[in-house]
């Protein structure tokens, strides 16, 4: 196996002015996570790339990282979280953070932010990746969304 190194860009944007951040229940968060999976797979289909399969370990790792409320890439934290979740390979990751966006629009905003950022877009449509995990955390400071896409041919140095 070989390792891969990538540089990704974090996109932080403000949402609608004056909108409040609704209290997000676990079911709303789970629904938004699944909607991100659906939207990422839609982007992949539009670009001629096979859909990703949900991976429980990557879902757990992404949710853990989102729950840490880290709004920028920390490779060691991400690699350790993915390894601890049980995913044995390398991965790509996207993060986006925003405020003042209703819970019902979280998934759409996250994927749109990634679509509009060249590095994030390339992570979403990487043909080497075959699995996906998503995490979302919302508090009074805003929402953070994590995306992990698993690459079975890449190496995680912490795994």
Predicted regions and their residues:
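C-terminal edge beta-strand
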Residues: 4-15
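Ser/Thr/Gly/Pro-rich low-complexity, disordered linker/stalk segments of secreted
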Residues: 16-26, 158-159
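A short alpha-helix/helix-coil micro-patch that ends at or immediately precedes a cysteine
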Residues: 21-71
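Extracytoplasmic/secreted envelope proteins and their assembly/folding machinery
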Residues: 33-41, 59, 63-66, 92, ...
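Surface-exposed patches in mature extracellular/periplasmic domains of secreted proteins
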Residues: 46-60, 73-85, 120-137
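Short, surface-exposed glycine/acidic/tryptophan-bearing loops
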Residues: 60-105
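Disulfide-stabilized extracellular recognition modules
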Residues: 101-159
